[in-house]
Amino acid sequence: MSDYTKYTKQEMQAYAIAKSIKENQIVIVGTGLPLIGASLAKRAICPSCHPIVESGLMDCDPVEVPRSVGDNRFMAHCAVQWPNIRFVGFEANEWLHDEDRLVAFIGGAQIDPYGNVNSTCIFGKGDYLQPTTRFTGSGGANGIATYCNTIIMMQHQKRRFIDHVDYITSCGWMDGPGGREIGRAHV
């Protein structure tokens, strides 16, 4: 019998992602832990799930763990490769038809108590135009956070969990309960 008591926090997070995916769900994932978790789910836990990534690949079944959503190892065994433009709006359309069938996992550099995620930049002593650190940005995360049953998965470090994100890349409840109501002004 194998000893499964020696694992890293990241391995446990990837496993938690894989276990929360259900049969026949469409699973939108980005690079990193979400990609690893979805790959594990497809390979070992629920082979009828359908991972999809922002580069347009759907129903991926990688032989090896891909390094990014555009990795050729991901492309080799996917059912569909859409042009990126077709991915835009997919989440909204799927959500309108069956919101329980669609789940997504995103990460980020910062998250606040209202679920707003920053994956764009850390201001530090600067601002948006001259931040201390700049990241790749939204990718598809903004649409995912808006239209999908979204699970936010990030490394558990105190500096990531803050009162107000420096920049809202993907909105949660904006400034609190009711923060996503149509027509409500936000600051």
Task: Describe every region a protein language model picked out.
Residues 1-82, 186:
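N-terminal active-site beta-alpha-beta segment that forms phosphate/nucleotide-binding
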Residues 2, 9-11, 65-184:
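Conserved phosphate- and dinucleotide-binding cores of soluble alpha/beta proteins
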